[in-house]
Amino acid sequence: VEDIQFRVIPKLQQAFGEIHLLDLSENYDFAAVRVGLQSFNSDFRGFVFNDINLGARVFGNWGNNRYQYNIAGFDMREKDTNSELNSFDDRGQEVMVANFFWQDFLWKGYTAQWSFLANLDHGGTHYDQNGNLVRPGPIGTVREHDVHAYYLGWAGDGHIGRVNVTHAFYEVFGHDDFNGLAGQPVDINAQMAALEVSYDRDWVRYKGSFYYASGDHNPEDGTATGFDTILDNPNFSGGPFSYWARQGFNLGGTSVNLKQRNSLVPNLRS
């Protein structure tokens, strides 16, 4: 008789409470706060931070829903190795987000967004449930390090006349107190840009997509110019139906990936 093994791993993926703070007008403008394990997407397409995690969020709108805002902070949980669900363990990483949306900005049907994100990553040494070292990433000089990265972004989504437009631009700056490839502390200065334009004619949609993330031509100097996200999951240029976005590509059997699953950015993370 073959042995049958059972494994029970309790997880709580999403659970939150929401309080309605006040009404701002008779047109359903409001302010509210939500606390707990909750989903959050920092922009229209999930370019920088798109996750379900433990946090608190104040959000609302005014001006007949023309203006909307979010102010949120997340105390990130570790992910289960095999299911990728949230565990109850603290990851040692805090993420803060503030963004503002303006509907019908310049053109009717076009919504603009401005964002600020802070990634304060103090995660120490961590092995996954399969015994692999995943933090710090085993590439270059392997040593615990803290990363403070700050993102400024402008994004937009909607249509200008009959042309559908989605775009985003992010500048990230900050400091890594020990970069494994450089073997020294580095300052962060990197950029990302995305543009998707489409046009509908009868039953056909003609679409073109462009995505750019800056690289680092000299990873051993004191400036890190390669763009990386906090935890992206972009719905762009095919999103989860794109082979490049859906798959993570491993480097030579190590726990380091050229890029992560559900990401567009090559980042050498584990």
Where are these regions (language model features)?
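Signature for the C-terminal beta-barrel architecture of outer-membrane proteins
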Residues: 15, 27-33, 38-224, 266-270
